[in-house]
Amino acid sequence: MPGQTVSDLVDAAAPALEIRALGKRFGAKVAVDAISLVIPTGSCYGLVGPNGAGKTTTLSMATGLLRPDAGQALISGIDVWQHPTEAKQLVGVLADGVKLFDRLTGEQLIRYHGLLAGLDADTVASRCSDLLAMLDLTGAGTTLVVDYSAGMTKKIALACALVHAPRLLVLDEPFESVDPVSAA
């Protein structure tokens, strides 16, 4: 809505994520069939199921990466498809299989994501430094992402999802390619 900020649209009493009858077909294949789910703020949920069950498709629709054929997704009460810009400001997404700008260094990539999220340069610099340290990537911050291992790439993608301090964090296959010590 013109003149409104994200804060104006957020419903503090709303769940962190609400999915209402989301559905998606790929041709004749039903990938997701009217799934509904309410995830309260402050909670941690996992979607578990066999390969091809629709977990990634569901998360992609819920976070605005894939348009559903039916249903609705709300982040803190904001409809992902009616107010996509505002909703996406509230969520950090570690998507499975999404390519990164791997010709940037890890530090440059995190800074890029922070600036895209509308953070000022000083805040981005501080958060970038903190995230590199937290994820044990300080020494790799000046290395091109293309030269990272699969596990390091996953960690730098997580840093990009966290840089703007989102209200909701959605992780798809977060431990794939990550060493057991980092996963713990």
What is each stretch, according to the model?
Residues 144-151:
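Conserved ABC ATPase signature
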